[in-house]
């Protein structure tokens, strides 16, 4: 068998080294320098298992067991387990506490992985209403309406799911209202915090949450794939049920999950997470500044106003107008940004785009704003 492996050698990526990355799916997952150092110690397969005591969450060296206890405090929950991502966390909950055919009531802004998890767990769903253009806010009262409708139809409800911050518009849902509805109706409540935990303060107990699904690589300065599932002790026996064959292994975790660099990078970044969520107001100031400075150019921010999250979605008719007369067509914006050391915006996009300045310095934010102003003013 002959296979040419030359294309797999010397694979490189220079986006983070040479450019300012504006991609909202990546801004929260950028590793600080101190976290990168740990990669050299744990890049071998199963290196975290040097002193394994039978299960990942019980490993003492490195102190994964203590880290998970501390993470529970950080999130305001009782018990935390590492997973491969928020999607796996959601599936673990659905597959353990719901019965086949049960309904999951979820918001209209839910991520596609919520639906995939529902389908994989052989469940049904009922989607709640959201506000109209241009805000698209989750309507908490719609949860009560959908629950009543399902109950009247004699449908079994297994779970209430809410996307804390959606990836399309960056809207922050009213968790407390939905949590009160779930509690009053007597249903378990799962909060998808893929875009929030690690970026902004989260306290599950204050929010009436039973489960938190978090993403290490999306919002907690960790390499991927890595996530967390935090639960209330009330659901420990159901969600963390162990195998009858190997009694130490938890079924929903398939024994062990993130057993390598991802979980170690998350641990190394933990101190940074604790500090950065305290500065969330400063992140919002930077985000709102971007919106206020760019809208006069002909950009229109979609989603709730003022911004309560770092994800910014712009409709950009002005870019469309420029693309019609520029010989580069829809690629001009990407190329002009790249020429100025800015990346993370999709190539060929002119009708709308998403961006984030999370974690950038004020000087960098000003540079981003001024660069976009220059591009528009020179080419319009």
Curated annotation (Swiss-Prot):
Top enzyme class, one word, equals: transferase
Q: Which cofactor does it need?
A: pyridoxal 5'-phosphate
Keyword entries, A-Z: Protein biosynthesis, Pyridoxal phosphate, Transferase
Q: State the InterPro entries in the record.
A: PyrdxlP-dep_Trfase, PyrdxlP-dep_Trfase_major, PyrdxlP-dep_Trfase_small, Sep_Cys-tRNA_synth_arc, SepSecS/SepCysS
Q: Name one GO biological process term.
A: translation
In its UniProt record, a GO molecular function of this protein is: Sep-tRNA:Cys-tRNA synthase activity
* UniProt binding sites for pyridoxal 5'-phosphate: 86-87, 192, 215-217
What catalytic activity is recorded? Answer: O-phospho-L-seryl-tRNA(Cys) + hydrogen sulfide + H(+) = L-cysteinyl-tRNA(Cys) + phosphate
Positions of post-translational N6-(pyridoxal phosphate)lysine modification: 218
Family annotation (Pfam families): SepSecS
Report the EC code(s) recorded for this entry: 2.5.1.73
Query: Per the similarity annotation, which family is this?
Result: Belongs to the SepCysS family.
Q: Main role? A: Converts O-phospho-L-seryl-tRNA(Cys) (Sep-tRNA(Cys)) to L-cysteinyl-tRNA(Cys) (Cys-tRNA(Cys)).
- NCBIfam families annotated for this entry? PRK09331.1, SepCysS
Under the subunit heading, UniProt states: Homodimer. Interacts with SepRS.
This protein is called O-phospho-L-seryl-tRNA:Cys-tRNA synthase
